[in-house]
């Protein structure tokens, strides 16, 4: 069985083709599309990465390029299109309408369009990708896999905001959470590493990248997560502010008239804040760490603020879960920054979290434990694999 995973952004289409018998990647790549500087970068299991300039201005053209490439007699990975059994689409926001992965139907597409207003940066692009795939691959079923779906098990007291109730009823304003596909994947891997069923475990998973979220999981179900109605809430991130006093927004609008424009205000909090905002240097943790070691005070402050915000969520979720069995670090920073992991875990021995400095500093891209022998909580580094999780969800959805 072959599954084609598609992730449509506002100006790009990423794809991965899986052979599900052994869950191996056959081909993968990205088409960056636009009026200028568009390119196609691709790789297969038997060939090196190649990058070419292309003239692609739409999702439809990008999908057409990908399919033609997969079918190419010389460099392709399949002989005919019928080898693809199902297409899995990554969808960032499913609102409270979609609590699980679903096969694409007219009704599902109608429901997805209703989510445009709560995720205007992502959902229209996802929808365009679905239409492009339907045009190029008629007859092959598509499945939508939602980043928000894994978090739909949160109890109402965890997802509710203390606003007038009508804002929830009429406008569906509530906590949704994101990175669900990643949190789902690493929690399953953690159970395997610990040699136990997910139903026996209490876990905290930390997806730390340019965007970051922390999730509390009990018996395989999400109890709480740090991101909210949008991915802006929660811990300090690369360019996102995370949790702030909402009254600050009204104050900023008052002192800076340009922020009366909602797009400018949104850009301030999403693209100009976080590590970048505090340091004035970069939203990239690698640059921040380098500058901090060179005695840049703002970089050091940005680093410490981010790590402190993550530590607060971990400590809070430990209390909510009444103890945990494992703490998982994943995604770009979580997997690759030992200095961040150590800063977060230091002085958490009171709640059973003790990191082994030597293990933590070992360079490796594999799943591994980095806790001390005496740590009550097992600390794990687990590389995420959202594409594989989408492929699994698509396969399982097709079979049910």
From Swiss-Prot:
It is an enzyme of class 2 (transferase). Disulfide bonds: none annotated. Coiled coil: none annotated. Substrate binds at residue 90. It catalyses: acetate + ATP = acetyl phosphate + ADP. One of its GO terms (cellular component) is cytoplasm. One of its GO terms (molecular function) is acetate kinase activity. PROSITE patterns: ACETATE_KINASE_1 (PS01075), ACETATE_KINASE_2 (PS01076). Mg(2+). Can also accept Mn(2+). Keywords: ATP-binding, Cytoplasm, Kinase, Magnesium, Metal-binding, Nucleotide-binding, Transferase. Pathway: Metabolic intermediate biosynthesis; acetyl-CoA biosynthesis; acetyl-CoA from acetate: step 1/2. Its main location: cytoplasm. Mg(2+) binds at residues 7, 386. Its EC number is 2.7.2.1. The active site is at 147 (proton donor/acceptor). It holds the Pfam family Acetate_kinase. It is found in: Cytoplasm. Its cofactor is Mg(2+); Mn(2+). Belongs to the acetokinase family. Homodimer. Catalyzes the formation of acetyl phosphate from acetate and ATP. Can also catalyze the reverse reaction. This is Acetate kinase. It comes from Endomicrobium trichonymphae.
